[in-house]
UniProtKB/Swiss-Prot annotation:
Prismatic layer of shell (at protein level). Expressed primarily in the mantle with highest level in the mantle edge and lower level in the mantle pallium. It is found in: Secreted. This is Mantle protein. Keywords: Secreted, Signal. It comes from Pinctada maxima (Silver-lipped pearl oyster). One of its GO terms (cellular component) is extracellular region.
Amino acid sequence: MLAVLLFAALVATAYSQEYGPAKPDVKIIPHPKTVVHEDARHVHRQVHLVKQVPVHRTRVQTIINEVPRIIRKPKQIRKTRVFRQYYPVDVPVLRKVTVVKPVHLERKVPVPRMVVKDVPHHVVRTKKVDVPIDVPIKKIVEKKVVRYVENKIFRPRPVVQEKVRVEHVPQPFPVDQVVVKKNPRPRLIVEKKPVPVIRHIHTHKKQAVAVPRVKTVAEVVPNVVHQKVTYPVGKGGGSVQIPGGPLPVPEHYKYKGYDK
């Protein structure tokens, strides 16, 4: 049964296909559409409402986190008194009277505390000696000049002595009911303790030394005259006279009695 179905499918496929030369490939190229690109720009002139681009402005705000300042003050304690008044009708009447209680405040009071601090210094002892100096003093002759004014009336001028009297008049002033509690606070008082410093001073004094009178004689340099020395040259027995002193012996003449 399976073979029959397979054969029928192959036959149907053969009849359905058209026999003949192959058709060429056809590519469909779509027609390009026109694309309109709209560029949004800042237009500072009066144009159509659709193309108008508004100018955006940015406002910068600085936000500061504010922290509340907490000031702690002592709370004043107040109390109310009730005054009973007697009337024909026994009805108590409350009359508020405010009594301010004293507020205790603490104030720091400096308490001296001595601190000894060693401070080095140079101890110098001086002594004053009075040295008499003869200074000629010119004698001044005083001449008394007497002037006379004729027919002069001397009238004494009154001298007024002002006497100022100061009176202290006490003036009333408001007094706050504030009790100040003094809280001691240490305060440093530095006392400098002198410490002597020893200074070693070395001085060098130049002392004149007697120098004998000695005449310096020039150094005598000997004048050496080099003599002419004769040296043998070669095997022929000849000799050469060389001025200026002896010369070193050649290598082939050594160990033959010539270098002695």
